[in-house]
Curated annotation (Swiss-Prot):
Residues 139-148 have a biased composition (Basic and acidic residues). GO terms for molecular function: rRNA binding. Residues 31-86 form a coiled coil. This is Nucleolar protein 12. GO terms for cellular component: nucleolus. Belongs to the RRP17 family. The keyword Repeat does not apply. Signal peptide: none annotated. It comes from Xenopus laevis (African clawed frog). The keyword Cytoplasm does not apply. InterPro entries: Nucleolar_protein_12. May bind to rRNA. The gene is nol12. It comes from the Eukaryota. Residues 176-186, 205-220 have a biased composition (Basic residues).
Length: 220
């Protein structure tokens, strides 16, 4: 009689007990976790788009202020040049004489109209005061008649704040939203086509070939 083999470790058995609720939640929660991951991804993409738009807005504002500053400087230069041109009454070009050993250039200074600078005329002090009063009154009237001129601001472009990064993020967001709302194509159309062909009595070429093959086999 052979000895019966004793099973090893009978006293040290381990039992694994699962929590039924957690087990059921894990097994049935694949779709739920997938939707949660998709939701977090969409929120992250939206956050990145907002940050990129804010960055682009700040860059556009800096460019706009730079353009405004350049325009104001250009307008100031033009006004100064216009004032100088009004004061100058005659202009002469410089003449250059070539000599074998020397080069001589002769330039003449343009005559200025000193009446624009308001030089006080020669005369009595009373006449000067009266003329100054008349000039002040004329200036006040001219200031009232002149409309208030303001520096024309550069127009802002109506284009949206878009960049390559924003375009790529919006494309991925659009793709994810389409995946979420998209449904699998149903086979109802195919079934409808089959039923309509049966009801009408028409058969396709492949169906006719199958039928002729079956009849030939039966005859053989």
């Amino acid at each position: 009689m052979g000895k019966k083999k004793q099973k090893k470790g009978q006293g040290s058995r381990l039992e694994v007990i699962f929590d039924e609720e957690k087990r059921r939640e894990y097994l049935t929660g694949f779709h739920k976790r997938k939707m949660q991951r998709r939701k977090t991804a969409v929120e992250e993409i939206k956050r990145k788009i907002k940050e990129e738009q804010k960055k682009m807005k700040e860059e556009r504002h800096k460019e706009y202020m730079k353009m405004l500053k350049e325009r104001e400087e250009a307008l100031c230069e033009l006004e100064e040049n216009d004032e100088l041109e009004e004061m100058v009454t005659s202009k002469t070009e410089s003449v250059r004489y070539d000599h074998p050993n020397h080069t001589v250039t002769v330039t003449t200074i343009s005559d200025l109209d000193l009446s624009g600078i308001r030089v006080p005329p020669l005369g009595n002090a009373e006449q000067k005061q009266e003329e100054e009063k008349v000039e002040e009154e004329n200036e006040k009237g001219a200031d009232e008649e002149k409309p208030k001129t303001s520096v024309s601001l550069p127009k802002k472009s109506g284009d949206p704040f878009l960049s390559k990064k924003i375009c790529s993020l919006t494309a991925s967001l659009h793709a994810r939203s389409q995946r979420k709302s998209g449904k699998r194509p149903s086979r109802t159309n195919e079934n409808k086509k089959q039923t309509s062909s049966k009801m009408s009595g028409r058969t396709s070429k492949t169906q006719r070939r199958k039928q002729t093959g079956k009849t030939r086999r039966r005859r053989n």
